[in-house]
Amino acid sequence: MKVISFEGFEYSGKSTQIKLLKKYFIKNNIKSTFTREPGGNKDLEKIRNVILKSNFDNLSLIMFFFASRFALLSSIKKSDFIVFDRFFDSTYAYQKYNSKEKKLIISLIKLIDKKFIPKITFYLKLDKKNLIRRKNKRLYSNKFDKKYFGQFSRIQKNYEEISKIKLGERKFVSIDASLSANEVHDKIILNLKKCKLIK
């Protein structure tokens, strides 16, 4: 079982790339499970709704995210690939955590069964100019979109910070999300082949 995760700010094209990868796996008869965080199944979608509508403090949010995460991982059936739409990097990147809280997150990540640590994480990186352009085209945004849009630089810095932390053998790949959807998809497939995750 190989785990892949997708990360990036809203409007980076993350959902589009996940759909393209899903089509690629189906076309090539690769058995895969696609899920998202927070959420992932009927019960955990309820936790997702609580998180999105809440005003919890940082520690409570960390506990909610990891309770949901551990429950999701224990429910996943064996598959060739598990693909996450957001994983622990988002937990680290989005909130205004102090150094003590960040250490707690890393400690909790290290409690995750090694088989669930991603072999590769794709971070779709978008500059603020392109992000604003895409945001203005979108009709819908949730509470987190609105809340964190003004914190772009801090979130990007946190993504770069966690990318340098060694977590198992995972490879953290940053891709220019301003490229066309097909160009980004090609880079994703190329990196999966480079890492010998697919042929």
What are these regions (language model features)?
Residues K14:
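Conserved lysine of the Walker
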Residues Y11:
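Walker A (P-loop) phosphate-binding loop of P-loop NTPases
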Residues K22, K129-K199:
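NTP-dependent small-molecule kinase module
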Residues F6:
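Hydrophobic anchor at the beta1->P-loop junction of P-loop NTPases
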Residues K23-S32:
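Post-Walker A helix-loop "phosphate-sensing" segment adjacent to the P-loop in P-loop NTPases
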Residues T33-I112:
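ATP-dependent small-molecule kinase phosphotransfer cores
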Residues Q17:
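Hydrophobic positions on the alpha1 helix immediately C-terminal to the Walker A/P-loop
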Residues T91-K157:
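A glycine- and Lys/Arg-enriched "phosphate-lid" helix/loop adjacent to the NTP-binding pocket
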